[in-house]
Amino acid sequence: MLRNRVPRRGLAARRREHEVDAVNVLARPGSSSAARDARWYPTFLAVAATIAGLVLSACGASSRSATACAGSVAPAAAANPVQRENARPGTPGWQIPAGAGSVITGFASEISVAPGQSFHLHVAAPPGSRYRVYVYRLGWYQAAGGRLITCLPGCRSSQVATAQPPPTPPDPVTGLLRAPWQVTDRAAIPPDAVSGYYEAKLEIVSGPHAGAVGAIPLIVRQSPAAAPSAVLVQVPVNTWQAYNRWGGKSLYQFNTPSHALAVSFDRPYDQQMFHDMATALELPWVRFLECNGIDVSYQSDADTDADPGSLPRHRLVFAIGHDEYWTQQMRDAFDRALAAPTNLMFGSNSGEWRMRYADERRTIVEWRDPSLDPAHDPRVDNGFFGAFGEPECRLMGVEHLWAAQRDLTAPPTAYTVAGPASDPWLAAAGLRPGDVIPGVVGYEWDSMIPGCFAGTVTPLMTTRLAGSDGVTHSADMVRATAPSGGLVFAMGTMQLAWALDDLNGRAPDPQLVAFVKAALRDLTRPATPDIHAPRTPATQHPAT
């Protein structure tokens, strides 16, 4: 999230005082904050590139990851769709090097689709070059990491790229720009497709640019006709787009000459930034969940906004990775789900900024400061959720505080067990107070806020580390129990999965694996009332 914030002396009031100091709101070239972020970003990219390179070697080695898959979390009942899908042979070649996409790139007209629907792709490549599109589903697949679903126009054929127009000029007020490209390809998703992270890999197959690749991320939702999965993963596409600098505009000052107040899904993702988000923080979780046979499905932030009633149909909802940007409707959906009760799981720095959609959810609007927002509507004005009386800690038990961030190149810090040895999740892993789980806390983290959460908050792990201001801050992992009985597992870190899967070249930590499996078993037990709530008409929303 990359901004300056002041130490909390309360809740929302302290944030209001210092919103004008936020790097991503009003940082000026040459300011100390902007300079700090300019120093930070190249090192972030270097680490992300290293991680992306390690993907290539990690996918061929299943011995280390076998630790994370031993003793599956899933019950020994009939195989669920994810188990059946991951039993199929994987396909190498889905990996995209960090920083690719400068020669061939593209985006989809849809953020997500249901099985049986299609993605409409807008691909740009040097005119006259021939290219092919490979569509993969990403998952475990015995450590292969992906499976080839189809090729466009065919796995042995290709098509000629035509010229696409330049991006639109940035809007003089908001900085909004789009890529007004024609649809070049249609990727039909089979009716029996399994929900998940999908990827359209773009490759030039002949000519001087042969071998150049790019990628378009795709999300396939669960079929409306299917029984709701036990676990729903919310994919943080809003945050991907907030940091996306393609065309020279993101919501941030640190990676663009001047930040925008609105960004569009009608443009490619900067491939480096996509690796920073999805490859580093999300795919290790996807691999861990699927190798353990978890009954899981996936939907985007935009899907939650379109169908807020979708959350309580599942036993556990996981806001994966770095899920920083929510609409008010999304926040309300999570609040209602916890009251249902549906259990919740978070990484860190989740649901912090309130944004809104425009253009049928193809545009994200984020003015940052409600006093500047031309909407002048307390239900949709932009800013911290805490500025509107809804701090994250009321939902999660923890919250991201000012300067609780540092350079990603710094080695992640260990968590220290803070809960009692009798705690069922800790006991399942043989963890006792004072034990350490190395290398899982860094980049951005969350802290407990006493008296904020309405229920009980049980500390599980903690650590203290210096933030970007040089001051020592706490990072806290907690289990919060709401008055409804719903549980919240707030990890306090985005990097926990770095010790659950070997995607980043590190062997899984056996005790952390056992701990997370115990947590998932508890969080996915059948809830009361019945999790299979009636589907609302909004469920049948079109591709988003």
Please state what every model-predicted region is:
Residues 160-177, 186-194, 274-358, 500, ...:
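Helical hinge/lid and interdomain linker segments adjacent to catalytic or ligand-binding clefts
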Residues 324-422:
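A glycine-rich, often tryptophan-bearing local segment used as a flexible ligand/cofactor-contacting loop or short
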Residues 128, 134-138, 150-153, 210-313, ...:
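Aromatic-Pro/Gly-enriched surface loop or interdomain linker
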Residues 289-291, 304, 325, 432-533, ...:
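Extracellular low-complexity, Gly/Ser/Thr-rich intrinsically disordered linkers
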Residues 55-72:
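C-terminal region of N-terminal signal peptides and the immediate post-cleavage residues
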Residues 190, 194, 378-483:
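Catalytic beta-strand/loop cores that center a nucleophilic Ser/Cys/Thr
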Residues 105-126, 135-138, 148-150, 157-206, ...:
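Ligand-binding face of N-terminal immunoglobulin V-set domains in extracellular IgSF glycoproteins
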Residues 82-103:
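Proline/serine/threonine-rich low-complexity linkers at boundaries of modular beta-sandwich domains
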